[in-house]
Amino acid sequence: MSSSVQVLSETIEIGKVVTASDEIAKRFNNLFPSIPMMLATFIAFVIVFLLLFFFLYNPVKKMIRKRQEFIQSQIDDSIKAKEDSLAKLSQAQAELIESHKQSVNIVNNAKSKAQEILASYKNKAISDANRLIEETQIDLNERKKEFDKNSRILIAETATEIAQRILKREISKSTQDEIIKDFLEDKTPIEDI
């Protein structure tokens, strides 16, 4: 009711007398556009659609396809880079394990070499000590023989002097040398004399 009053008030303002049924019919006719207008709108829509399709949709679709290809190539590159990095990581780990084995071998070889050198120096020191002991023993034996010889000479000379005094006669040099020679050739140890 309020709309019909409003319609009436509009018609009164304009100065024309319009009935409510005329107004409703006019509005009802305005709901359906005219066929030429509808056809022109449809043709304009088709033209705009085709223009948008060829000038906007296809380039956008190509750009989207290129973007998808770029993204896919980036994904493929990242997958390949990941695989490469995993391969390099496993290779580095294998090299680390190998270098660890080599370092253990080097340490073990160094230990065994050090033990061999230590044993060599120990054996050399023992042989040098034994050689020194033998040389010292030989030297002691030679000195003992020298001492025994000198002692025999001294004893022979002393005995000759004592014999001369006892006999109060002079022994000739040849007799003295003969007695000393016999005494020196005697192999009886000094302790037994």
Curated annotation (Swiss-Prot):
One of its GO terms (cellular component) is proton-transporting ATP synthase complex. It is found in: Cell membrane. The keyword Transmembrane helix applies. It is a single-pass membrane protein. Coiled coil: none annotated. Keywords: ATP synthesis, Cell membrane, CF(0), Hydrogen ion transport, Ion transport, Membrane, Transmembrane, Transmembrane helix, Transport. The chain crosses the membrane at residues 35-55. Its main location: membrane. InterPro entries: ATP_synth_B-like_membr_sf, ATP_synth_b/b'su_bac/chlpt, ATP_synth_F0_bsu_bac, ATP_synthase_B_chain. The keyword Cell membrane applies. It holds the Pfam family ATP-synt_B. F(1)F(0) ATP synthase produces ATP from ADP in the presence of a proton or sodium gradient. F-type ATPases consist of two structural domains, F(1) containing the extramembraneous catalytic core and F(0) containing the membrane proton channel, linked together by a central stalk and a peripheral stalk. During catalysis, ATP synthesis in the catalytic domain of F(1) is coupled via a rotary mechanism of the central stalk subunits to proton translocation. HAMAP family: ATP_synth_b_bprime. Belongs to the ATPase B chain family. PANTHER family: ATP SYNTHASE SUBUNIT B, ATP SYNTHASE SUBUNIT B', CHLOROPLASTIC. F-type ATPases have 2 components, F(1) - the catalytic core - and F(0) - the membrane proton channel. F(1) has five subunits: alpha(3), beta(3), gamma(1), delta(1), epsilon(1). F(0) has three main subunits: a(1), b(2) and c(10-14). The alpha and beta chains form an alternating ring which encloses part of the gamma chain. F(1) is attached to F(0) by a central stalk formed by the gamma and epsilon chains, while a peripheral stalk is formed by the delta and b chains. This is ATP synthase subunit b. It comes from Mycoplasmopsis synoviae (strain 53) (Mycoplasma synoviae). The lineage of its organism: Bacteria, Bacillati, Mycoplasmatota, Mycoplasmoidales, Metamycoplasmataceae.
